Curated annotation (Swiss-Prot):
CDD domains the record matches: VWA_YIEM_type
UniProt xrefs under PANTHER family: PROTEIN VIAA
Pfam families in the record: VWA_CoxE (PF05762)
Keywords noted in UniProt: Chaperone, Cytoplasm
Record's protein name: Regulatory protein ViaA
Localization, UniProt: Cytoplasm
Domain of life: Bacteria
Native organism taxonomy: Bacteria, Pseudomonadati, Pseudomonadota, Gammaproteobacteria, Enterobacterales
Family: Belongs to the ViaA family.
GO cellular component: cytosol
Length: 483
């Protein structure tokens, strides 16, 4: 079967001009003109996409097969070119019959040329073939234009859908022209309106929490700061975590003698019910010799001191990917869940604007991951936002997964962000040591986004920076009042 590309080569038909005309007609359509006027960023993104459109149209024209009737007529024309005038005169009745059988537009004109001349001279032979070729060129051009018109309608429909999607998500995810280009590339997937409305919903929630969005921007841009000490620098408050004596109970460490009634062993408490041993119980209570559970922990408090400001100058530094770990335990449900998802959406916005990768991991009893900056980033974001936080907390597995991922070359300068209320078990020593190694030798930065004021300081002390966003009712009311 003859392909359209072969036919164009045989008849010297140039499809490039037709492709350019089709693209110009598409871009000048009234629908796109209105959208371009409203959103210049989308116009720039589509302009950058034009080379891909041209290549797709060329591929489409190459793969199409020519109708059998046109193929047969072209083959007959090719054979007729090889005949001499006497041979052509002999084959002329069969050629005319073929043209009429194929319903060729040239059939009537060919018959008129034969009937209008008593002698079939070599000049008439040449004229016959020239007009026949011209008819074939017109048929091939018409066929090309029909295909391009179908492609134009399909492409226009696709562009309108993608522009509608991009227009809806632009306020949520677009911060500059770079992000607009990424969003346009992501919009190529098969998405329905009800799907991406979930992103719009959390975008609206983020707009109602300006402090949360500001926190995400500070975290995302935190690598810009370069410390430059100056003699005349003003003083600033410097916060450090100071270790206190082990007065905060975290876990059972064993048994010891004390007067702690709340942590008595059951056998000691049973002596109160025996009259002969009651005085003995009180004696041991006074002397702090009762057997009780020993609960120990590591208590840390925040110490505020004054020091000269060291962050005076700002110099752009390389920014690596985000590896964001989100706690999906039951305590992170409700408002905490909304804040965590909206925060990840804000980090996705920063990643698109700065050409950074954004990798989300949900940690509970198992690890589920999504990459929001990949070509299918919108679909991945929708799947992430559709998750429900109802599991347990396995912070150690989360850190092990982060450590394993940071071993790869493409993540050598990644920033890890852990979003949790940090109400969990203490991290194993081997995990803590590996994190410290990554921080010291590879300059990886670990950020904690604390959604509660009751997180365990013993867990959070391994982070380079702690970003606090208390979701308690009191803090929420205070933030609302300050607005």
């Amino acid at each position: 079967m003859l392909t359209l590309d072969t036919l164009n080569v045989m008849l010297a038909v140039s499809e490039e001009g037709m492709i350019e005309e089709m693209i110009l007609a598409l871009l000048s359509s009234p629908v796109l003109a209105v959208i371009f006027e409203k959103s210049p960023r989308l116009k720039k993104a589509i302009t950058n996409d034009l080379p891909r459109w041209r290549e797709a149209l060329r591929t489409r024209l190459k793969d199409v097969h020519v109708p059998p009737e046109l193929t047969e007529e072209v083959m007959c024309y090719q054979q007729s070119q090889l005949l001499s005038t006497p041979q052509f005169i002999v084959q002329l009745p069969q050629i005319l019959a073929l043209l009429y059988r194929l319903h060729s537009p040239y059939a009537d004109q060919a018959q008129q040329l034969v009937d209008g001349n008593s002698r079939f001279t070599p000049a008439l032979h040449t004229l016959f073939l020239q007009r026949w070729r011209l008819s074939l060129v017109v048929q091939a051009t018409t066929f090309n234009q029909q295909l391009l018109e179908e492609e134009r309608e399909q492409l226009l429909s696709e562009v309108q859908e993608r522009m509608t999607l991009s227009g809806q998500l632009e306020p949520v995810l677009v911060d500059n022209d770079n992000a607009a280009g990424h969003l346009w590339d992501m919009s190529a997937g098969q998405l329905k309106r009800g799907d991406y409305q979930l992103i719009v919903k959390y975008g609206d929630f983020l707009a109602q929490q300006p402090e949360l969005r500001q926190l995400a921007e500070q975290l995302g841009r935190s690598r810009e700061a370069k410390s430059v000490p100056r003699k005349d620098a003003p003083m600033e408050a410097f916060r450090t975590l100071v270790r206190e004596p082990a007065t905060v109970p975290e876990q059972v460490e064993g048994l010891h003698q004390s007067d702690d009634i709340l942590r008595l062993l059951p056998p000691e408490l049973a002596t109160l019910g025996i009259s002969e041993l009651e005085y003995e119980f009180y004696r041991r209570l006074v002397e702090k010799q009762l057997l009780t559970y020993r609960l120990q922990g590591e208590a840390w408090r925040e110490k505020i001191t004054e020091r000269p400001v060291t962050h005076q100058d700002f110099e752009e530094q390389p920014r690596g990917p985000f590896i964001v770990c989100v706690d999906t335990s039951g305590s992170m449900g409700g408002f905490n869940e909304q804040c965590a998802k909206a925060f990840c959406l804000a980090l996705m916005r920063i990643a698109l604007a700065d050409n950074r990768r954004c990798f989300i991991m949900l940690f509970s009893t198992e690890i589920v991951s999504y990459e929001l900056s990949c070509p299918q980033g919108i679909e991945q974001a929708i799947r992430f936002l559709s998750q429900r936080f109802r599991g347990g907390t396995d912070l150690a597995s989360c850190f092990r997964t982060i450590i394993e991922r940071m071993q790869g070359r493409e993540w050598f300068d990644a920033d890890a962000v852990v979003i949790s209320d940090f109400i969990a078990q203490r991290l194993p020593d081997d995990v803590v040591n590996k994190v410290k190694t990554l921080q010291k030798e590879h300059q990886h930065r670990f950020h904690a986004v604390a959604m509660s004021a009751h997180g365990k300081p013993g867990i959070m002390r391994i982070f380079d920076h702690i970003w606090r966003f208390d979701t308690g009712m009191r803090s929420r009311l205070l933030r609302r009042w300050r607005r």
